[in-house]
């Protein structure tokens, strides 16, 4: 009996190993593409993106392949953000998360039920690589808020850019807790890295994105939420069996705003919003800019503020408004444009209008009124004869 149990356990272990090996296999949808092409063919995944150049929206879209973006938090907003950037052809993505995929996550976008049990970064990397094998995916499965992991996070975002030893081009915060946001804020203030913060409310009907430039705009510690300002432990706020609401629509909209502004920043087109909110109840989209707090608790934020104030201010060159010059300076024929509602001084009788420019003559003269028109224009004489008298006159004829 013991031998049979041992054999069954060995078979189970072998099957588990085979399953893990199969799950570890990363599917590849196509071969890598060396250069983006604007050729409009069904086999070109970049033709619609490169059309932005033809329409003068982006000068050189292929520059996106030289960009590295770090995404912290691969949940409802972060996974969709990674998906969008991958489809846009970003050069490199660095994913940070320590959570696992659960069936409770299926109300959100991106993840599938067969990925339950996998780490979020691992599941995301496999799907993203299958979507676009041209994008390099780097994963880190740890909590960035611990001391050791924070140092690893700091070294990664400052040295794992597209070029070895260079910082990432942008950090995107898609986490769902203030502790992680403060960790990202501290790292970006210390290394003077621009980053976007994003979030969705607990009732799932509002979201926001915020662009933070150390020293120029308010950092996350300049105006902290109450839970941070009062040093409250977030874990004590969550009751057992109670969870925040989650709508894939709100998360998709927030992720769309986040990626849209990230692309504008990376490819230098359009205007990047410093703060953009969204209220789903009345479709309200507030925009604002938050100035840094001179009494911020983050010493690196205060240092960046001093550095920013010491920088020479960019000189704004005011372009002269173009003057409305006539398209054709010479007007030999005396032609003028008259507004439709302008009173006309021209005579109504064309036969009297013979004042034409030099070198022109009338093709014909307007005819005089015919005798028929003159007869119609004449006024009939007034007669007091009654209808009975007229009938009698007609019968006598």
Swiss-Prot record:
InterPro entries: D-isomer_DH_CS1, ThiF/MoeB/HesA, ThiF_NAD_FAD-bd, Ubiquitin-activating_enz
Keyword Nucleotide-binding attributed: yes
Entry binding sites for Zn(2+): 219, 222, 296, 301
Keyword Membrane appears in the UniProt entry: no
GO cellular component, as recorded: cytosol
Alphabetic keyword roster: ATP-binding, Metal-binding, Nucleotide-binding, Ubl conjugation pathway, Zinc
Pfam families, sorted: ThiF (PF00899)
Catalytic residues of the enzyme: 243
Binding site for ATP: 76, 97, 120, 143, 177
Residue ranges, annotated region (Disordered): 343-384
GO molecular function, one term: metal ion binding
Domain of life: Eukaryota
GO biological process: protein ufmylation
Family label: Belongs to the ubiquitin-activating E1 family. UBA5 subfamily.
Reported function: E1-like enzyme which activates UFM1.
Protein name: Ubiquitin-like modifier-activating enzyme 5
Source organism per UniProt: Drosophila pseudoobscura pseudoobscura
């Amino acid at each position: 009996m013991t031998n049979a149990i041992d054999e069954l356990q060995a078979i189970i272990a072998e099957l588990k190993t085979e399953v893990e090996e199969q799950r570890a296999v990363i599917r590849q949808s196509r071969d890598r593409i060396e250069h983006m092409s604007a050729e409009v063919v069904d086999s070109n995944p970049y033709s619609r993106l490169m059309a932005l150049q033809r329409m003068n929206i982006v000068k050189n879209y292929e520059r996106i392949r030289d960009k590295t973006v770090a995404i912290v938090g691969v949940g409802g907003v972060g996974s969709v953000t990674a998906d969008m950037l991958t489809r846009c052809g970003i050069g490199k993505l660095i994913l940070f998360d320590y959570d696992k995929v659960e069936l409770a996550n299926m109300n959100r976008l991106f993840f599938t039920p067969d990925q339950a049990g996998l780490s979020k970064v691992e599941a995301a990397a496999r799907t993203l690589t299958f979507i676009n094998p041209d994008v390099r995916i780097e994963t880190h499965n740890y909590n960035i808020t611990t001391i050791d992991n924070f140092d690893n996070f700091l070294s990664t975002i400052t040295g794992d850019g597209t070029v070895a030893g260079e910082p990432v081009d942008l950090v995107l915060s898609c986490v769902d807790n203030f502790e992680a946001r403060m960790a990202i804020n501290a790292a970006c203030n210390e290394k003077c890295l621009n980053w976007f913060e994003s979030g969705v409310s607990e009732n799932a009907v509002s979201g926001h994105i915020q662009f933070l430039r150390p020293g120029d705009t308010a950092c996350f510690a300049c105006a902290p939420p109450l839970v941070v300002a009062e040093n409250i432990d977030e874990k004590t706020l969550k009751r057992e069996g109670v969870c925040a609401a989650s709508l894939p629509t709100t998360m998709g909209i927030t992720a769309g705003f986040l990626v849209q502004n990230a692309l504008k920043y990376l490819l230098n087109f359009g205007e990047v919003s410093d703060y953009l909110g969204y209220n789903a109840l009345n479709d309200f989209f507030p925009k604002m800019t938050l100035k840094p707090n001179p009494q911020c608790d983050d010493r690196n934020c205060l240092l960046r503020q001093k550095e920013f104030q010491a920088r020479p201010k960019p000189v704004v060159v005011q372009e002269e408004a173009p003057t409305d010059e006539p398209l054709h300076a010479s007007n030999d024929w005396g032609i003028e444009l008259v507004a439709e509602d302008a009173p006309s001084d021209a005579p109504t009788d064309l036969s009297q209008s013979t004042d034409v420019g030099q070198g022109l003559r009338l093709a014909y003269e307007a005819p005089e009124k015919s005798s028929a028109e003159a007869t119609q224009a004449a006024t009939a004489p007034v007669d007091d004869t009654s209808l009975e008298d007229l009938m009698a006159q007609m019968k006598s004829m």
